[in-house]
Amino acid sequence: MAWEHLRVTDTPTWPSILGRLTTGQNLGTGQAAWAMDQIMTGTATPAQIAGFAVAMKLKRPTSAEVTELADVMLKHARRIPTDIIGNETVDIVGTGGDGANTVNLSTMAAIVVAAAGVPVMKHGNRAASSLSGGADTLEALGVRIDLGPEQVAASVAEVGIGFAFANQFHPSYKHASAVRRELGVPTVFNLLGPLTNPARPRAGLIGCAWAELAEVMAGVFASRNSSVLVVHGDDGLDELTTTTTSTIWRVQAGTVERLTFDPAAFGFQRAHLSELVGGDAEYNAAEVRAVLGGAKGAVRDAVVLNAAGALVAHAGLSSDAKWVPAWEAGLARATETIDSGAAEKLLARWVRFTQKL
């Protein structure tokens, strides 16, 4: 129905927007942006926010709608200055919400990638559904997570990695986050964290817990000229998994290509999900120290795989990156970075640097 996609010229209202969503119609250009602006400025009521969040998820959001939501959220965010660090940094983050309560694979992978010499600009938060999110675990390791924009940029410039704690950088999101917590079910807002990194890095390994929405996220990154791998473990993880295959939406030069990825092709043994399960922040911090200290096993394998994925995404910023050679190089670099002690040293340097600020 072509008329559904016509530009809507009427001034948006909540009844008109919720009316479209609850009858399964896509929003007109600018309507999602209007709704998000109402939410971010505190104008929308909790009932309007909840209705919008749930109805949008049930309709299934389009990439155009989610792009508008993310762009408005970034407009209200505290920006990280990129004049020193540029935007050819990489983020490693997932939507969360996979219910698996794994150890913090993306946090460990981020440290490995930074130690391999690729600047990491990580966006993250405390746990929503698991016992310990990336922010909780970094705090337990001694990394200060409450840094402001200039301090985070300095951390990337000096150490090679910075962490943007979502609460610090998206103060206007507080209206939505309270509603999101009360609802307790995934909504369209779950997609926004990985799409609203305040430093706008151009590369990323982005996990999505919902296969049907991963392609929507990939479409947003494609519109930004990013080099990103949006990944969904076929066991449901919002990471590249080692228990089975993963589906990858490879975003490069404005296009999206869907691939099935089998780590066994690169020599990885199949793991059991139980081997990747984490605990509270102290438990997960101990797991980080063990893996960076050289401990072998399923967690290390998953960390190496995800670190390599981020290195592949970053390599994709140059147009001549070939898929299989990039993976082989990424896996070798990630392994060497752990085995040489470089990743362990980088974490110690990061802790020292942030504690001095």
Swiss-Prot record:
Residues noted as binding anthranilate 2 in the record, renumbered to the chain: R180
Cellular-component GO terms for this entry: cytosol
Residues that, per the record, bind Mg(2+) 1: S106, E239
Residues at which anthranilate 1 binds: G94, N125
Manner of cofactor binding, per the entry note: Binds 2 magnesium ions per monomer.
Superkingdom in the source lineage: Bacteria
UniProt cross-references to InterPro entries, sorted A to Z: Anthranilate_Pribosyl_Tfrase, Glycosyl_Trfase_fam3, Glycosyl_Trfase_fam3_N_dom, Glycosyl_Trfase_fam3_N_dom_sf, Nuc_phospho_transferase
This protein's pathway: Amino-acid biosynthesis; L-tryptophan biosynthesis; L-tryptophan from chorismate: step 2/5
Binding site for 5-phospho-alpha-D-ribose 1-diphosphate: 94, 97-98, 102, 104-107, 122-130, 134
Alphabetical keyword list: Amino-acid biosynthesis, Aromatic amino acid biosynthesis, Glycosyltransferase, Magnesium, Metal-binding, Transferase, Tryptophan biosynthesis
Catalysed reaction equations from the record: N-(5-phospho-beta-D-ribosyl)anthranilate + diphosphate = 5-phospho-alpha-D-ribose 1-diphosphate + anthranilate
Subunit: Homodimer.
Name the UniProt record assigns to this protein: Anthranilate phosphoribosyltransferase
Organism: Mycobacterium sp. (strain KMS)
Lineage start: Bacteria, Bacillati, Actinomycetota, Actinomycetes, Mycobacteriales
